[in-house]
Amino acid sequence: MSSNIKLAQKDYKGDKEFAAALHGKEGHKKHGLGAVMSKNKDAQAAAVEGFFRNWGDKDRSKIEDADEQGRIEDYAGLTKHYYNLVTDFYEYGWGSSFHFSRYYKGEAFRQATARHEHYLAYKMGIQPGMKVLDVGCGVGGPAREIARFTGANIVGLNNNDYQVERGTHYSEVQGFGDQVTYVKGDFMQMDFPDNSFDAVYAIEATVHAPVLEGVYSEIFRVLKPGGVFGVYEWVMTDEYDESNPEHRDICYGIEKGDGIPKMYKREVAVKALENVGFDIEYQEDLAADDAEVPWYYPLAGEWKYVQSLNDIVTIGRTSRLGRMVTMNVIGALEKIGLAPQGSRQVTEALEDAAVNLVAGGKKKLFTPMMLFVSRKPEDKN
């Protein structure tokens, strides 16, 4: 697909006002079901409509091309509305690092999460004092962990005001000062000058780009010559067959449940990196091997891998049984008016995502951790 995508109009003032209306001025300090129940009902309805309007039938074979094109053209609005709706659920189930990890026997969930972040920083060679950009930083869990691990100064870029506020709050509470900061912005059209950063990384975030060349070209632009870009990319693997209806349904379930305009295959990511000028120094699908503990085990609810009391809580929430409990509780709260309309619909989309992520993982059709480490040549600007 061409990278000639119409960029979203920037309306930072309007975005901030909408986030304040939806979440409240102190919403970033609330957690779990309390945060879900505190949303403004009118703003929640607008967010639900804004997210679901470009999704058609559940069966991808019945989807019109116009639906997909609409999502691609509305990439910024789609992603902003998605994270306005799901951030509280993500934190409730997963913590402050919104990504999957490799797991080893005897390793607790939080330990694996931190190691996965450390591994990326290690492969990139991030050093103390470097100025590093985290593209699509979520609420800043990885940024804070990598800052601790490396001593680098991290700038988190995020187009969702609610997540920027939450990340800023967590970093202030944890005493990071100026070492970890957050900036509102669209990663398809960053507001940073050319050659601003020593290194750039993205953890399962650039999948929200309408086309990968667009976001990769912006990363290339803001990276200093000789700088390194590391990414855990979500891609469909070489095993994925677009002509296979089962494969298409799995892909569509992942797209809809995770707010993704369009999923691409591994080869598309490779070509996109090369086309914008990067030299790929390392690439590996970290989910390709038959690991004893699969990356999707928290969603599959495989209790035999639980290693700690914290894991019991986490897997209790992320497993299918835990998700069903959450969905029904949210549905009941919605019926009696304590949760905004559309809350259960959001949990249903997240459930669809979880089921298809597990299916995609088991069939080796999808990976959330296609690792690329690429470098901007010294003579390129």
UniProtKB/Swiss-Prot annotation:
Top-level EC class as recorded in UniProt: transferase
Pfam family, one: Sterol_MT_C
GO biological process, one term: methylation
Cellular component, GO annotation: endoplasmic reticulum
Catalytic activity entry: zymosterol + S-adenosyl-L-methionine = fecosterol + S-adenosyl-L-homocysteine + H(+)
Pathway(s) of this molecule: Steroid metabolism; ergosterol biosynthesis; ergosterol from zymosterol: step 1/5
EC number assigned by the record: 2.1.1.41
The organism's place on the tree of life at top rank: Eukaryota
Keyword Lipid biosynthesis: yes
Sample GO molecular function, one term: sterol 24-C-methyltransferase activity
Keyword set, alphabetical order: Lipid biosynthesis, Lipid metabolism, Methyltransferase, S-adenosyl-L-methionine, Steroid biosynthesis, Steroid metabolism, Sterol biosynthesis, Sterol metabolism, Transferase
Family: Belongs to the class I-like SAM-binding methyltransferase superfamily. Erg6/SMT family.
UniProt protein name: Sterol 24-C-methyltransferase
Species of provenance: Yarrowia lipolytica (strain CLIB 122 / E 150)
